[in-house]
């Protein structure tokens, strides 16, 4: 899953985007603690992260993680973060901007794919269209929707810290979602979340299913390199 932010960095560099990363100053956003009921432990992380971003003078924050996006855009204000003049975008939203600007030349990527909506990106943040716009912006890709998509999408099984509590629940839900993906006939399952990728990859290995799982940022990077 480390390949996801690495792919995004490669895409942004190729597009000529002026950006920086926090490196070692990037702390966890605190979302796993919040979902575990440890709200009081989130504040130090929030204060550190907000201060570092202000120090950089950044105007836009781009994250490849839907949980981080939800935390910065929804939870931090609720938890008392000071108002900051920073636009918070998920990577899929920023990729749409890059593709629409014409800053990238993409090669053909002939593949039938299906897309899994992450819970934190879709139902919780309302971001459904942008990942699909990215997918459809890659030449040669045919997108086939699963039975459950958008608001009706099944969880990958790995959200909400559930895997820490009961891995069997995660496995059962992931197996069901993988079955929905298989029925589309796609050989490539796309998502926009590192946890979804990890969980669905594990399900494919467990069930010996010959499908690949990839993030939309990795799709753009592959098409860019191709």
How would you describe each model-predicted region?
Residues 1-226:
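Iron-sulfur cluster-binding electron-transfer modules in prokaryotic oxidoreductases
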């Amino acid at each position: 899953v480390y390949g996801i932010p690495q792919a995004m960095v490669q895409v942004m560099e190729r597009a000529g985007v002026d950006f920086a990363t926090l490196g070692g100053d990037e702390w966890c956003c605190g979302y796993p603690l919040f979902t575990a009921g440890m709200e009081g432990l989130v504040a130090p992380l929030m204060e550190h992260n907000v201060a570092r971003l202000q120090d950089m003078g950044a105007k836009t924050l781009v994250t490849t993680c839907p949980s981080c996006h939800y935390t910065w855009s929804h939870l931090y204000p609720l938890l008392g973060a000071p108002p900051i003049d920073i636009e918070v975008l998920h990577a899929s939203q920023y990729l749409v901007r890059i593709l629409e600007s014409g800053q990238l030349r993409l090669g053909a990527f002939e593949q039938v794919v299906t897309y899994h909506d992450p819970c934190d990106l879709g139902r919780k943040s309302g971001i459904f269209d942008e990942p699909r716009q990215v997918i459809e912006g890659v030449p040669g890709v045919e997108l086939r929707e699963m039975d459950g998509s958008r608001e009706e999408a099944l969880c990958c099984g790995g959200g909400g810290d559930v895997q820490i509590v009961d891995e069997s629940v995660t496995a059962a839900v992931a197996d069901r979602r993988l079955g929905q993906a298989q029925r589309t006939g796609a050989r490539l399952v796309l998502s926009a979340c590192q946890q979804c990728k990890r969980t669905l990859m594990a399900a494919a290995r467990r069930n010996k299913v010959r499908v690949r799982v990839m993030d939309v940022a990795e799709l753009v990077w592959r098409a860019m390199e191709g």
